Amino acid sequence: MSSTNNTSNNIAPVHIGLVGYGWWGKIIAKQIATSNRLKLLAIVEIDEGMRQQMASDPFLKDVQVLSSFDAFLKITELEAVILCTPHLLHADQIVNAAQAGKHVFCEKPLCLTFSDAQRAIQSCVQHKRVLGIGHERRFEPSVIALRKEIGAGVFGTILQIEANFSQDKFFALPKDNWRLSNKHAPVGPLTATGIHLVDLAIAVLGPAESVWANLATRGSYFENGDTLGIMLAFPGGANALISAMLATPFEGRFAVYGSKGWFEIRDRKHPENPAGWDIKRVMQGQEPVTSFADQSPTVLANLEAFAMAIRGEQDYPVTHKEMLANVAALEAIMKSVISKSIETIAAPV
């Protein structure tokens, strides 16, 4: 069932195409199938064996399967594309899609360098295309409510954020998978999971100004690391302490500490198969309050927000400045794990 409904106002679904039909691409395709705001027309998949499997998949019987991104962009009916591709490819694919008149939804991270992110965003602005980003954690109902309360001053001055997004799912991947490659996914715990927490920290505190980070491979054979610690510093003195590991069972936690109280969100299961969130709230002079928030289709909510922006119903809720701030932080983190020093983060302009 779709998280929003557009049948009453007869808004046509956005004709969309998917680039990459791996682990996450399959999840995206299943989410699209539940939406009346999106219609999947085509998929690009370069792996011949995968394309053969797709040809006999009844789920894809009305979907065109191609091997060429260029041919895909020439499909006239296609309004938008979703990129589930290796990170190094994102910038050029965004630029090419925007030049072809397509709106673009890119899985995280948007790009691996600040200059590439600037180039990609500028192309979308120039061609008046909507750019979406796969930071679905922003769409969790508890995160939305928390940000509103922070904005209203309920928690006072925000002092610090503590967050953890760890998993061991990558042990199931072939050893030559691009997600385990130092070239295609440098600082693996960051590009896999930690970048979501960087985004949430920016959503709460704004762009960060400096970072120190440490990366190691301690519990796996992953060449791009499995254990990452990050300390982001923000203007005014607030910090975000972020932990991301790829060699331990799933943990998802986001906590914001303020001068009047604090708020913690814990995932019960991995976002791939969500089971809701345990919430803890502690206000100054009061007893702790715990509650449960039922699971919500956040991936779908993000995709439908993208579709609504394309149709002019609303602005896409992640700004270009926030996207740039995220990639600026990512690039500085990657520098810090090499230099072992505090690195300055580029201002998102």
For each feature predicted by the language model, list its residue ranges.
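Active-site loop of classical SDR/Rossmann-like NAD(P)-dependent oxidoreductases
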Residues: 27, 290-304
